[in-house]
Curated annotation (Swiss-Prot):
Its main location: nucleus. Transmembrane segments: none annotated. Keywords: DNA-binding, Metal-binding, Nucleus, Transcription, Transcription regulation, Zinc, Zinc-finger. A motif (Bipartite nuclear localization signal) lies at residues 150-166. Disulfide bonds: none annotated. It comes from Oryza sativa subsp. japonica (Rice). The lineage of its organism: Eukaryota, Viridiplantae, Streptophyta, Embryophyta, Tracheophyta. Zn(2+) 1 binds at C93, C98, C115, H118. A zinc finger (SBP-type) spans 90-167. Trans-acting factor that binds specifically to the consensus nucleotide sequence 5'-TNCGTACAA-3'. Zn(2+) 2 binds at C134, C137, H141, C153. InterPro entries: SBP-like, SBP_dom, SBP_sf. This is Putative squamosa promoter-binding-like protein 19.
Length: 352
């Protein structure tokens, strides 16, 4: 019992010494001092007391030091909080007498030190002067720098208006390139109406220039007449076609067809491809009795609804069609035409 009481006293004394050593930062010296004090007791009791004191010192160093450092951490946070409070004072609204908490406002208002209400107020007092917050500069300006009813200062509005008034959209406006746009009278698509060019006509036909005119077809019929090769069914017609399409086998076949050019003035025969040949014949085998008739139709000019058609020559081809007993023949006048810009007409007549 005495030994246990002594050990308890030594342990309590060692803890007290450890606490004092922690306060004075002399822990190791206290341990060296605690050893001789227990010389009156047994060696086992002294060893137990020393072990208890060492354990108590270890627990104190593990638990007490972080606990002592915690207030410093709190002070640092408090300092930051105080700094935040000071910063909150620095980030407070710049308007005199405004105590709005900017920590609940947007970052824009915190950065420019103005609350949301005073950012839109027409007149506020800042540092004893009546000012207004500019929406574009994000700063307070004197009232003289604002126009009536404007939320931005005059300097920023002038630059903004100059940028907006630049005529950039007119050069790139797609409506100006459309054919139906009335402001600009031009079109991307050119007009495709053909126009007669007198110079081009002179280059194509330097020896044969005639004023352009339209052609109208007019027929004069006395009575309907059937050709002999059309009355014997289909055999005569087929034979006639075959005979008309075959090449000339003798000079007599070619002698019955003649081409006259009454309007080709001064053009050589070899340079006139527009004189057509008519191969209408009444018999399969032409006879010498069949005459050759050449006629020239005088040009008759009349208005026409046909547009852009011109006759480059008035050459006609006359083919004699005989029914076997008559001497006078039936002839057809066929003008050779090309497509140009005409204003007058040339007749197409069928005479029987």
């Amino acid at each position: 019992m005495e030994w246990a009481a002594a050990a308890t006293k030594a342990a309590s004394w060692g803890m007290a010494v450890a606490a004092a050593a922690a306060a004075d930062d002399a822990g190791p010296t206290m341990l060296s001092f605690a050893g001789p004090s227990s010389s009156s007791s047994s060696p086992d009791a002294a060893a137990a007391a020393a072990a208890a004191a060492a354990a108590a010192l270890h627990d104190f160093s593990v638990r007490a030091r972080p606990a002592a450092a915690a207030p410093a951490t709190r002070r640092a946070r408090g300092g930051s909080g105080g700094g935040g409070g000071g910063g909150g004072g620095a980030e407070a609204c710049s308007v005199d007498g405004c105590r709005s908490d900017l920590s609940r406002c947007r970052d824009y208002h915190r950065r420019h030190k103005v609350c949301e209400a005073h950012a839109k107020t027409p007149v506020v007092v800042v540092a004893g002067q009546e000012q207004r917050f500019c929406q574009q500069c994000s700063r307070f300006h004197n009232l003289a720098e604002f126009d009536d009813g404007k939320k931005s200062c005059r300097k920023r509005l002038d630059g903004h208006n100059r940028r907006r008034r630049k005529p950039q959209h007119d050069a790139l406006n797609p409506r100006s390139f459309l054919p139906y746009h009335q402001a600009n009278q031009f079109s991307v698509y050119p007009q495709t109406f053909p126009i007669a060019d007198q110079n081009a006509d002179a280059l194509m036909r330097p020896l044969d220039r005639h004023p352009p005119f339209s052609i109208s077809f007019s027929g004069t019929f006395r009575e309907p007449k059937q050709f002999p090769f059309m009355q014997d069914g289909g055999s005569g017609l087929g034979a006639a076609r075959h005979d008309l399409l075959r090449p000339f086998s003798s000079p007599e076949d070619g002698a019955n067809i003649t081409t006259t050019r009454s309007a080709c003035n001064g053009v050589p025969h070899g340079l006139d491809p527009e004189c057509a040949l008519s191969l209408l014949s009444s018999s399969l085998h032409p006879s010498p009795a069949a005459g050759i008739s050449s006629a020239t139709a005088p040009p008759q000019f009349a208005p026409s609804s046909f547009s852009r058609i011109a006759a480059s020559s008035q050459a006609v081809t006359t083919a004699f069609a005989s029914d076997g007993g008559s001497v006078a023949g039936d002839h057809v006048l066929v003008p050779a035409v090309t497509y140009e810009d005409p204003s007058q007409a040339m007749p197409f007549s069928w005479q029987v």
